[in-house]
């Protein structure tokens, strides 16, 4: 039983004149249905979230960013109705570290995930766990790359980090008829045809089901392309680029330009395919009348050098590697008039920003910044720099290939980094967008270099980052690495050790 003191005027909105106050005793039998309906209403007012994460899509490769070669009409339309965070970066530009920061809101030296193919702590407070606790349905489709038990192994529910709906493979770069596992079954299944197309169909089915639910949802779609191999998109998209002359970045060495142009055709074909699927997902949300209260995020885990500075793939601090597309579409909060934001959003900032937009308390474990008030225009953006880093080079940028540890700051206009030996790179990204003129050590830029060094030290102090040699962190976290200081992922058992054959 519960006592509630009200007046007839409050109950029926009558004038209080000549009415005397009355006290009523309401039983919980009467009140509970009312309270439940309020809870359901509040839940329905929470935004849905469709988070589209692609792999290795650099920021410069969209029509809306000014690229006249790649065909991305659906993304261009989405950008015209969204906030385009033009300075979004992947602070540790490689797959697993970005995904761990996305899930935890933490920097790599806090969650321990600073290399590929290591396990994100199953006890971590993660994005899906927080949303699930707040009443959300949670789902994940596609590439995971946070399990650390080899790339083809079944991931049991205890390592699914709070996602209820689950169609996932740890990692593959075969984008046609690749394998996946569902939530509680170790039976290997296969996507039908091109993975991104089949996964999109699964998203559409999920949205149909969620339209019948009173709960909001968080659905993450993680697409493996346009990461290499570049030439495996469906023919209907490859034909757009056949024999097409492609603009190649000026920082690509002459000896690589023919290869890079050919690879870029395939890279763009993957993108145009994905773009078409994004159009389907948007149309489904509109058909279900869910578009206005659904936050759509489109972004990538990192970029792709694709020949720039003589390298492919990522890890390095150049623009093509660290800068990622980042569109956030939320009509109920932002309207549908597109805008461009200079906010320096980094990988750990995504979780708190989504929580802020969803009016969910941010856990104390989160280190990233909540940009929701900035995006809504309620606060001024006071962030002047953000941290970029490589804690331990490995794989395609192992030491024998020139890989090295670095720490740096990105301010939008400037990129500054130092390695273990001292200042390494300084670029003015406005006057030198392809970063071909290193300003380190030039007398006329000494004041700028000192200012950026001070900013870097401030960021390192915030993170308690001592900037040690990479193997010190490998030993601290007890990771097993091979002769190239890379975590092995082929023939690995559940303790993370290679299987002796």
Describe the function of each predicted region.
Residues 1-2, 19:
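Secreted/periplasmic carbohydrate-active enzymes, especially glycoside hydrolases
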Residues 11-13:
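Short hydrophobic targeting helices and cationic amphipathic motifs
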Residues 20-30, 38-419, 424, 433-454, ...:
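Formylglycine-dependent sulfatase
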Residues 430:
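A short, internal acetyl-CoA/4′-phosphopantetheine-binding micro-motif in the GNAT/acyltransferase core
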Residues 465-481:
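Short, charged, surface-exposed hinge/linker loops at domain edges
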């Amino acid at each position: 039983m519960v006592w509630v003191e009200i007046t007839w005027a409050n109950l029926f909105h009558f004038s209080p004149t000549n009415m005397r106050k009355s006290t009523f005793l309401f039983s919980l039998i009467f009140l509970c249905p009312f309270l439940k309906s309020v809870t359901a209403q509040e839940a329905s007012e929470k935004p849905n979230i469709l988070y589209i994460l692609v792999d290795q899509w650099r920021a410069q490769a969209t029509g809306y960013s000014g690229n006249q070669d790649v065909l991305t009409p659906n993304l261009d339309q989405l950008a015209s109705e969204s906030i385009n965070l033009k300075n979004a970066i992947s602070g540790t530009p490689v797959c697993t570290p970005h995904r761990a920061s996305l899930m935890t809101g933490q920097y790599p030296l806090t969650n321990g995930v600073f290399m590929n193919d290591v396990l994100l702590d199953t006890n971590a407070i993660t994005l899906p766990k927080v949303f699930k606790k707040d009443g959300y349905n949670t789902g994940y489709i596609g590439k995971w790359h946070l399990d650390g038990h080899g790339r083809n192994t079944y991931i049991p529910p205890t390592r699914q980090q709070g996602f209820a709906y689950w169609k996932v493979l740890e990692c593959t770069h075969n984008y046609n008829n690749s394998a996946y596992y569902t939530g509680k079954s170790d039976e290997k299944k296969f996507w039908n045809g091109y993975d991104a197309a089949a996964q999109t169909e699964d998203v559409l089915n999920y949205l149909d089901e969620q339209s019948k639910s009173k709960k909001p949802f968080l659905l993450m779609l993680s697409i493996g392309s346009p990461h290499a191999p570049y030439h495996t998109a469906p023919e209907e998209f490859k034909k757009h680029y056949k024999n097409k002359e492609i603009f190649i970045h000026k920082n690509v060495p002459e000896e690589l330009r023919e290869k890079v142009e050919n690879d870029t055709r395939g890279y763009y074909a993957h993108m145009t395919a994905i773009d078409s699927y994004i159009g389907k997902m948007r149309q489904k949300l509109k058909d279900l009348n869910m578009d206005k209260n659904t936050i759509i995020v489109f972004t990538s885990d990192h970029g792709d050098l694709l020949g720039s500075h003589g390298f492919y793939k990522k890890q390095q601090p150049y623009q093509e590697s660290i800068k990622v597309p980042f569109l956030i579409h939320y009509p109920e909060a932002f309207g549908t008039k597109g805008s461009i934001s200079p906010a320096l959003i980094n990988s750990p900032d995504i979780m708190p920003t989504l929580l802020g937009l969803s009016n969910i308390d941010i856990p104390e474990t989160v280190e990233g910044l909540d940009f929701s008030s900035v995006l809504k225009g309620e606060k001024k953006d006071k962030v002047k720099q953000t941290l970029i880093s490589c804690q331990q080079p490995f794989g395609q940028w192992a030491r024998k290939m020139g890989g090295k540890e670095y720490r740096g700051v990105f301010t939008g206009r400037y990129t500054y980094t130092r390695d273990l030996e001292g200042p390494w790179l300084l670029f003015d990204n406005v006057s030198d967008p392809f970063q071909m003129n290193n300003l380190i050590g030039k007398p006329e830029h000494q004041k700028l270099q000192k200012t950026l060094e001070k900013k870097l030290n401030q960021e390192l102090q915030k993170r308690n980052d001592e900037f040690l040699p990479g193997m010190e962190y490998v030993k601290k976290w007890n990771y097993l690495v091979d002769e190239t200081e890379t975590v092995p992922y082929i023939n690995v058992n559940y303790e993370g050790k290679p299987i002796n054959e």
